[in-house]
């Protein structure tokens, strides 16, 4: 049976109130999207930001009556005419999303592939990953940069005969970076995130890729004397600057630090924040985003 949807454009301050009202009126899902393609780059700590102009779509499986619409308009505080009602096809939305999510290549060997697809490459290192609860499927430039770094590092280690005993994925999201590091040869990984959904997704994804036994998840930030050969943090520039002493302390001598989630114009500030411990340099940029990388010297001074 076709479903119905209410679409409404509103400002940031109204969004949470309207979302709750739609659920109370029987909505099975509510999606908030940006009306004007405005980026949200640096919310304050603990703040959840929406766009200045937000489009809300609430989906209903039961027919929307005139009475329901009138009551909803009263609760929201708008004229009923602002509530745009439309019919949408009765689809399995997860399958629709998966249909658009195709295998992606990162560097020479690393691929992310949805569970319904395969990669025709005998040398491929494949991560099976479907869109889910947590951020990080490789579609965002910052995630792509980190994955390409991991692929390049694995190729370098293969040529030099080096190994990677311990990787830390700081702010793991879906766990894709930790899983990629393990699939590319790291012996053990620690995946940290404060979001319980992220840790659940990380565990599920690690199990699906056969690396759960080599992965430790943590909802408390790793502390020294844990010493990583490689630490990746794909978060925002503000937290990256604040965390500089902690992240630097988690690196063993000659350990590598990879930072992403920042724009090119934010790189200088982040590089300066880490300068007491190591020298970060731009590794690669993509669509205005930059990935920084550096190695901590044996003495813990800038290298």
Model-derived regions: residue spans:
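Conserved SAM/SAH cofactor-binding pocket of Class I
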Residues: 133, 137-224
